[in-house]
Curated annotation (Swiss-Prot):
GO terms for molecular function: DNA binding; DNA-directed RNA polymerase activity. A non-essential component of RNA polymerase (RNAP). It is an enzyme of class 2 (transferase). InterPro entries: RpoY. One of its GO terms (biological process) is DNA-templated transcription. It holds the Pfam family RpoY. This is DNA-directed RNA polymerase subunit epsilon. It comes from Leuconostoc mesenteroides subsp. mesenteroides (strain ATCC 8293 / DSM 20343 / BCRC 11652 / CCM 1803 / JCM 6124 / NCDO 523 / NBRC 100496 / NCIMB 8023 / NCTC 12954 / NRRL B-1118 / 37Y). It catalyses: RNA(n) + a ribonucleoside 5'-triphosphate = RNA(n+1) + diphosphate. GO terms for cellular component: DNA-directed RNA polymerase complex. NCBIfam families: PRK13667.1. Keywords: DNA-directed RNA polymerase, Nucleotidyltransferase, Transcription, Transferase.
Length: 70
């Protein structure tokens, strides 16, 4: 399953929508996706979204789409 992670790079700053960044990771479940992010980054995670097949197809149309691996 592909998950879209919305995060802030600097955990000490207040989250602002204008500075929210996203990445995509592959995981078997939402808890595993959160665990992967927490173990490999210092990011302030705002939201983790499980993407449907249609959503993945839509996101792949973006030239910047890339599934991050750690």
């Amino acid at each position: 399953m592909i998950y879209k992670i919305y995060y802030q790079e600097h955990p000490e700053r207040n989250p602002k929508r204008e500075t929210t960044i996203s990445m995509y990771i592959e995981a078997e479940s939402l808890p595993q996706a959160r665990e992967i992010i927490e173990e490999n980054t210092e990011y302030n995670v705002e939201f983790i979204e499980e993407l449907s097949d249609k959503a993945v197809t839509y996101e792949k149309a973006n030239p910047n789409f890339e599934v991050t691996t750690f």
